[in-house]
Regions:
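Aromatic (often tryptophan-rich) hydrophobic motifs at membrane interfaces
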Residues: 111-187
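Well-ordered, non-membrane alpha-helical segments in soluble/globular domains
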Residues: 1, 46, 96-99
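Conserved active-site alpha-helix within GNAT-family acetyltransferase domains
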Residues: 6-21, 48, 175-187
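Alpha-helix C-terminal capping segments
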Residues: 13, 53, 103-106, 158-163
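Acyltransferase donor/substrate-recognition loop-hinge adjacent to the catalytic core
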Residues: 13-87
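Short, conserved active-site entrance elements at the starts or edges of catalytic domains
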Residues: 68-122
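A short amphipathic beta-strand at an alpha->beta junction
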Residues: 1-7, 167-170
Length: 187
């Protein structure tokens, strides 16, 4: 709703609307190239975490999600759900329903995805789709919390391999979750 549209509505219905801006649902939009390169002081911590991951898991690999490996992501998501108390938290449970259905319907939804392996096992994955010619949106990103550096590396690798043709990446909102907000603001 633009300012002009709001003013027009107000002129037709004086005092009937209250406009608020819910901070919890603001999207985080970044220049893709900056999140691929992670150059400069601002990204020093991210690079350190990535380097720690690479040192701890020298056999690590990145793969595009395909029909042949999407089931492994599904199984990883089930383990992630169990480890993160999703059954007890209605919001987390809903989020996991979306994640699991997105993996089940990966092809039908025309999603792009990437995964990280360490020790031959999937330790992180991400899913998204283009929303216009210059912007790609990341809907889902999961990694095991005890695998240090998995989150920044899946983000960086996915963008490098699948999203580099888009000027911007929208990493969606933080839903008011402080940990997620801190992570997204750190980029």
């Amino acid at each position: 709703l633009s300012t002009e549209e709001m003013n027009e509505l107000e002129s037709y219905f004086p005092g009937k609307f209250q406009v608020t801006w819910p901070r919890d649902y603001e999207d985080y939009v970044y220049e893709t190239e900056k999140l691929i390169n992670l150059s400069g002081k601002k990204y020093h911590g991210k690079k350190n975490h990535i380097n720690q991951f690479k040192a701890a898991y020298p056999d690590w690999s990145y793969e595009t999600i395909t029909d042949s490996n999407v089931e492994e992501c599904f199984q990883m998501a089930l383990k992630w759900r169990g480890a993160n108390g999703c059954e007890e938290d209605p919001e987390k449970n809903q989020e996991m329903c979306v994640t699991l259905n997105s993996l089940r319907l990966f092809k039908e939804l025309h999603l792009k995805g990437g995964l990280l392996r360490a020790g031959g096992k999937v330790v992180a994955f991400t899913l998204g789709e283009p929303v216009c010619d210059d912007t790609f949106v990341v809907h889902i990103e999961k990694a095991y919390a005890d695998v240090r550096g998995a989150y920044p590396l899946i983000n960086q690798q996915f963008l490098e391999h699948e999203v580099s043709g888009y000027k911007y990446v929208n990493r969606e909102d933080d839903t008011g979750e402080e940990g997620l907000r801190t992570a997204k603001l750190s980029y």
